[in-house]
Swiss-Prot record:
Organism, scientific name: Burkholderia ambifaria (strain MC40-6)
Name used for this protein in its record: Octanoyltransferase
Keyword hit for Manganese: no
Source species taxonomy: Bacteria, Pseudomonadati, Pseudomonadota, Betaproteobacteria, Burkholderiales
Note: In the reaction, the free carboxyl group of octanoic acid is attached via an amide linkage to the epsilon-amino group of a specific lysine residue of lipoyl domains of lipoate-dependent enzymes.
Matches recorded under InterPro entries: aa-tRNA-synth_II/BPL/LPL, BPL_LPL_catalytic, Octanoyltransferase, Octanoyltransferase_CS
Gene that encodes the chain: lipB
């Protein structure tokens, strides 16, 4: 699997189409940035800088990215959840909530840089909207999934992989604004998850869409997910316009 570097594409999502074809004006416009394959530290530093320097007039943004292999450990995370210290995958300590997780090729990572006060959103409501967007995205591929109380993320609803985690979520709120976000596993090498207790849960199975016999294209899933996120954030049923696709292969 590979991702060719592409320029950052900024797509203001100001007007979308309703199911009936009539224009719908979202409550708060959002800019979608498709950042391609990018080192985790680059994204981390950029989202912190964006949040630290934003003002009341700064627009909200959603960043879509794919990272090279990396473990990230939340600010209250226990390093003991990294079970194999010499795996060859770097570990980065970060300031989001949650424990340890893995990012790698074939996984969609979405960062939500939102002014919650302007959107009149409580953190719990934001988490629910994000989880709903993931559930709706998976449903578009005939995959049933659920949330679990007290365990942010999305889990397989039934079948041989019932209870397995397919999407992770972790946020940081600073001065009323969010950053970090979510990851959704499409088609990836899942072996690095065996070297950790995913999100701090020993023995938690982690799967991707391919494990569930869905041969989904990374770009298509990413576009669906971004559309559902924007629709849920703005309380509309309309899907967002599709930004330019990343040069991406699921091979």
């Amino acid at each position: 699997m590979s991702v060719s570097p592409v320029p950052i594409v900024s797509t203001p999502v100001a007007v979308s189409e309703s199911p009936a074809g009539s224009p719908v004006q979202p409550a708060v416009p959002v800019t979608v940035r498709w950042r391609g394959s990018e080192a985790y530290e680059t994204s981390f530093d950029a989202m912190r800088a964006f949040t630290d320097t934003r003002t009341a007039d700064t627009g909200d943004e959603i960043w879509v990215v794919e990272h090279p292999p990396v473990y990230t450990l939340g600010q209250a995370g226990d390093p003991a959840h990294l079970l194999v210290a010499d795996s060859g995958v770097p570990l980065v300590k970060v300031d989001r909530g949650g424990q340890i997780t893995y990012h790698g090729p074939g996984q969609i990572v979405v960062y939500l840089l939102l002014d919650l006060r302007r959107r009149k959103l409580m953190v719990r409501t934001l988490v629910t909207k994000i989880e709903e967007a993931v559930i709706e995205t998976l449903a578009a591929y005939n995959l049933a999934s659920v949330r679990k109380a007290g365990a942010p993320g999305i889990y397989v609803a039934s079948g041989v992989h019932e209870g397995a985690k397919i999407a992770a979520l972790g946020l940081k709120i600073r001065n009323g604004c969010s950053y970090h976000g979510l990851s959704l596993n499409v088609k990836m090498d899942l072996r690095p998850f065996l070297a950790i207790n995913p999100c701090g849960y020993a023995g938690l199975e982690t799967v991707d869409m391919a494990s569930l016999e869905v041969a989904a294209d990374w770009n298509d899933v990413a576009h669906t997910l971004v559309g559902r996120l924007i629709a849920n954030l703005d309380g509309e049923s309309a899907a967002a316009d599709k930004p330019q696709a990343l040069e991406h292969s699921n091979d």
